[in-house]
UniProtKB/Swiss-Prot annotation:
The lineage of its organism: Bacteria, Bacillati, Bacillota, Bacilli, Lactobacillales. One of its GO terms (molecular function) is DNA binding. Gene3D superfamilies: 3.30.450.40, Heat-inducible transcription repressor hrca homolog, domain 3, Winged helix-like DNA-binding domain superfamily/Winged helix DNA-binding domain. Keywords: Repressor, Stress response, Transcription, Transcription regulation. One of its GO terms (biological process) is negative regulation of DNA-templated transcription. It comes from the Bacteria. This is Heat-inducible transcription repressor HrcA. Belongs to the HrcA family. Negative regulator of class I heat shock genes (grpE-dnaK-dnaJ and groELS operons). Prevents heat-shock induction of these operons.
Amino acid sequence: MLTKRQELILKTIIQDFTKTHEPVGSKTVMNQLSIKVSSATIRNEMAVLEEHGLIEKTHSSSGRVPSTEGYRYYLDNLVQPLQLPEEMYNQIGYQFDQPFNQVDEIVKEAARILSDLTDYTAFAEGPEDKNVSITGFRIVPLAPRQVMAILVISDGSVKNQLYTLPRHISGDEVEQAARLINDQLVGKNLSEINKQTFEQLYSSQIVGKNAPEFLELLESVIKDAASEQMYVDGQLNLLNNIENSDLKAIKSLYELINSSSLAGELIDLSDSPSHYPVHVRLGAELENDLLKDFSLVMAEYSVGRYGRGTIALLGPRHMPYSEMIGLMEYFRQELARKLLDYYGRFK
């Protein structure tokens, strides 16, 4: 356990390093401390911090830099969220103050705003709502043998996919299939639609016999509607935060964050303490060597009965944590407010 003075010195080292990205010496610490301590005493205390593995020496300087353990101690015990500058509050409000037609548009915009504000890579996952249901299914002709399948969800979102009709299927048969699908699926929660539902439709003489490919299309549209949407923005910002120029590593990292399933696993908060609104995982804790020099700042937002979602920032390990935690605490509330405003239109 550290003394109060040792904690203050560790906090000073981390805050200075996240600003300058340069090793921190005892004189720098002495000039920034809020208490009067001699340089010799600070050197002794820094030696204790080094023995605990909380700071480490670099080869190129006599100063010290925080270790992963040092950052973790700071995040668990010392960090305090900073209030955002007034202009940043205004910027967030201004960029959210526009008409949105779907939940996905709001979530996608959230990722873009976060990335623009921080110059980091931002993730935004839409709220997972187990209670949304199908309110309509339509087939719209576009060309002689091309139609669009449109699925309307109770939260106001719309999913669609193009479908090319096989030559043996007539327009009347497609309309019959659409009517049957409406009868079977409209009003059902997405969470209730499963493999058995589609097996029943496949066994139908109208749908399964004449348009099995059409059912595959429908199944694809429904799976897309039921899955939480993940949006990533600022991928190229990774290049500013990669400490080596290994092209293979850069490519692998880019592929990692652009994979919805892998990104979803990355920002999964299921094993994080629920009493913290914002969580930070350091590179060594992310269980992926590609991310060892990064940190992930995550926050969950809630839109009541409409579900919960997650936002996250992927940036360098030496990011200014107080500022980023303060930003995420505020942003998650603003995103939830915007989504609740949207859902309120469908009451």
